Regions:
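Kelch-like beta-propeller repeat domains
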Residues: 11-309
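Secretory targeting and sorting signals
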Residues: 1-10
Length: 309
């Protein structure tokens, strides 16, 4: 279902996924929004779809346990919205999603209070499901793409802290939604792979804060949409896990090796079950990347896993 340093080192060839056993967890869901909130030092999850309806609950994870936050007001129930942390304003930005309608509202999460605030902007991207939100190498949150119910988008926007401003790079990736995207903090490069489009985009793009570059990788994952990507400081690489591919959900783990401009599949001693639409984030409290939720076929998941290199 779809709704620092420039030096690099080679990532190891193997790693292990370990399932965590927190005392409580959010209910099962897929196509949730999830990111690390640097202000509160916690991972935040919002919304998703549980097989019967859209969700609008907020949860945080401190490296040990999940906690439900009864926030009011709150964004409306939705799936396939996206979030990213704005280090300038120290707020989490949430945009878009789908709940029977395509959504174009902007919400800010203050994890220190904690509360949500709806921002009534003068300008905004189109109302879309599956936009790609990411911290840009210049320190702002950028948005690319999404699907508005008729067309896949290829516009790019930047959050100023109070409004959206459109960016016009000389080249942009092909239009798409629900791609896996993450920023490599060790290289200052954004990495984007896959997604949904009129023609399945089996390609890798990188962005340095000014220019998008289509990479000619010698090896790469299968085409996936709703895959989960995050930067892992332990590997100094962007990790890509899972995703849907032609109706078959995946559970492979890949890393983008920037110096070689190539993907490498990691041999994992254990792996979460296949899934699409899962949340992923690097959790400094654990010191590892974690994955939560998603769906495997019609099975909706609420398990939490950490990746140990």
């Amino acid at each position: 279902m779809v709704f620092g340093s420039t030096a690099t080192t080679a990532a190891p060839d193997s790693a292990g996924w370990v399932q965590l056993s927190p005392s409580s967890s959010p209910p099962a869901r897929s196509y949730l929004a999830m990111t690390y909130d640097g202000a509160s030092g916690k991972v935040i999850v919002f919304g998703g779809y549980d097989g019967t309806g859209y969700l609008n609950d907020t949860w945080t994870f401190d490296g040990i346990s999940w906690t439900h936050v009864a926030a009011s007001p709150s964004p409306s129930a939705r799936a396939n919205a996206q979030m990213a942390y704005d280090s300038v304003t120290q707020k989490v930005v949430l945009f878009g999603g789908y709940n029977g309608n395509y959504l174009g509202d902007t919400w800010l999460w203050d994890g220190t209070t904690p509360h949500w605030t709806l921002v009534r902007t003068t300008h905004r991207p189109a109302a879309v499901t599956g936009p790609m939100l990411f911290p840009d190498p210049n320190g702002r949150v950028d948005l690319f793409g999404g699907f508005d119910g008729h067309f896949y988008q290829l516009t790019m926007w930047q959050w100023t802290g109070s409004d959206w401003t459109q960016l016009v790079p000389s080249m942009v990736p092909y239009a798409r939604s629900s791609a896996a995207v993450a920023t490599n903090n060790s290289t200052g490069q954004v990495v984007m792979f896959g997604g949904l489009a009129d023609v399945n985009p089996v390609n890798t793009w990188t962005y340095d804060g000014a220019t998008w570059t289509l990479q000619s990788a010698l090896s790469q994952p299968l085409w996936v949409y709703a895959g989960s990507a995050a930067f892992d400081p332990n590997l100094r690489a962007v990790v890509l896990f899972g995703g849907g591919s032609g109706g078959i959900d995946q559970n492979s783990t890949w890393v983008w090796y920037q110096r070689g401009r190539n993907w490498r599949q990691m041999a994992t001693t254990q792996s979460p079950p296949p899934r699409e639409g899962a949340g992923i984030a690097y959790d400094p409290a654990l010191g590892h990347v974690i994955v939560f939720g998603g769906q495997n076929g019609d099975a909706y998941l609420n398990d939490t896993w950490e990746l140990i290199p």
